[in-house]
Amino acid sequence: MAPPTSKRIKTLSVSRAVIYGNTAKKIGENRPPNAPSEHTHLWTIFVRSPTGDDISYFIKKVVFKLHETYPNPVRTIEAPPFELTETGWGEFDINIKIYFVEESNEKFINFYHRLRLHPYVNVNPPMSTEVKKEETGNATTSDEISSIFYDEIVFNEPYEDFFKILVSKPGNLLPSNKTEDCLFSRQLEQDELTRIKMASSNVDKEIEIYKKKLEDTLKSR
C-alpha cells in the first residue's frame, strides 16, 4: 500500500453497493472441455454491482480461493467482470478478497460465500436463493440455481483523492422495484423489514402464551 498523497475527510462516510454469490446449472449431455467426469455442475462465482454498473473505478481486483482440490485454487481477477466459472460436484466455502484501487489506501476486505449447487429443501427458501427456468443449452440443463447476497461497502473518512473517485459515479442506487435485470430493490428491503417485524411479533405472542401457561401452572399448585 503506497503512502497517502492526500488527507482523510473527517466525519464522512461513503458507501457503495455490491452483490456477490454464485449461479449453478447441472451439466448436460455435451460436457464443457476438460471437465472431470465426476463433475456434475457448471457454476460461476462473482462480485458485481446490483444494477450491472462498472465497479472497477473503486475495486482493483478480486481474489477467489477455491477448494484445495482445484488446480491453482487461488484465482485473481484483475479486470471486470470480477467472476470466474468452474465445474464441480460439491458445495464448499469460497474465500473472497476484494482489493481497492491504489488511491483508496484501504485494506482489502475478506469474507466467505458458500457455493450452492442445489436448491434449498425447505418450503420457503430464503430470498437469496432461487431456481430460474431457462431454455436448455448445449452444455447445461434448464434449471439455474442462484445464491446471491446484497451488501454495502462503507468507506469511513476516505482520503480526498479516493473520495473524488467515489463521487465521480452515481453510486449504484437501487431501483424502487425489482426488475429482471436487478433483483434487489428498495421495495425488497422494505419487504424484508416487514417480515422481520412479523416474525418478532409472532415470537412475542408465543412468549406471552408460555408465560400465561407458566403462571397458571404455578397458581394451580
Curated annotation (Swiss-Prot):
GO biological process, one term: subtelomeric heterochromatin formation
Stored InterPro entries: YEAST_sf, YEATS, YEATS_dom
Keywords, in A-Z order: Activator, Chromatin regulator, Cytoplasm, DNA damage, DNA repair, Nucleus, Transcription, Transcription regulation
One Gene Ontology cellular component: Swr1 complex
Subcellular localization(s) per the UniProt record: Cytoplasm; Nucleus
Principal location class: cytoplasm
The YEATS domain, residue ranges: 8-169
Keyword Lipoprotein: no
Pfam families assigned to the protein according to its UniProt record, in alphabetical order: YEATS
Family designation: Belongs to the YAF9 family.
PANTHER family: YEATS DOMAIN (PTHR23195)
Summary of subunit composition and partner proteins: Component of the SWR1 chromatin-remodeling complex and of the NuA4 histone acetyltransferase complex.
Function: Component of the SWR1 complex which mediates the ATP-dependent exchange of histone H2A for the H2A variant HZT1 leading to transcriptional regulation of selected genes by chromatin remodeling. Component of the NuA4 histone acetyltransferase complex which is involved in transcriptional activation of selected genes principally by acetylation of nucleosomal histones H4 and H2A. The NuA4 complex is also involved in DNA repair. Yaf9 may also be required for viability in conditions in which the structural integrity of the spindle is compromised.
Name listed for the protein in its UniProt record: Protein AF-9 homolog
Source species of the chain: Candida glabrata (strain ATCC 2001 / BCRC 20586 / JCM 3761 / NBRC 0622 / NRRL Y-65 / CBS 138)
Gene from which this protein is expressed: YAF9
